[in-house]
Amino acid sequence: MTPEQHFILSLLSPMKTFPMVIPGHLRARIDRYRILRAQAGEDLNLSDIVRQALTLFAYARPVSWPTAEMDGQGKAVNVKLPSVVIEHVEGLAGFYNETKSDIARAAIVWFLDQEERGQHEPNRIAQ
């Protein structure tokens, strides 16, 4: 089984709760994305978008990513994620001596940047 196949199959495992804090400026950006997706007929909530962002980030395994600073307007959220995605975020947090929320916020910014460039398909992310 290839690593990609293993990753895809692991997404079928039961979801676990992942707590994180999302700053106000990032919530605003997520809301703009949610509105655009709604206009395209895709009804997504905050958890859906965060789950999609972290899953694609874990799958693509980019070698660099942007940061997302806290702004004093952060709100805690609990997102259901596949175990493999949580393990990826935890691994990066440990390796780079960051918090899991720091990595998760960076993943969301990375995802939204990809979406804005129209590069959200997995085969285009790797390029």
Residue ranges of predicted features:
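Short intrinsically disordered terminal tails
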Residues: 1, 120-127
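Short Lys/Arg-rich basic patches
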Residues: 2-25, 59-85
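Long, compositionally biased, charged low-complexity segments
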Residues: 3-10, 36, 113-117
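Surface-exposed, Lys/Arg-rich phosphate-binding patches that contact polyanionic backbones
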Residues: 8-12, 23-48, 83-102, 106
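Generic hydrophobic/packing signal
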Residues: 19-21, 26, 34-37, 54-57, ...
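Feature targets compositionally biased, intrinsically disordered low-complexity regions
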Residues: 40, 71-73, 93, 117
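Short, basic amphipathic alpha-helical segments that act as recognition/interaction helices
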Residues: 42-67, 100-123
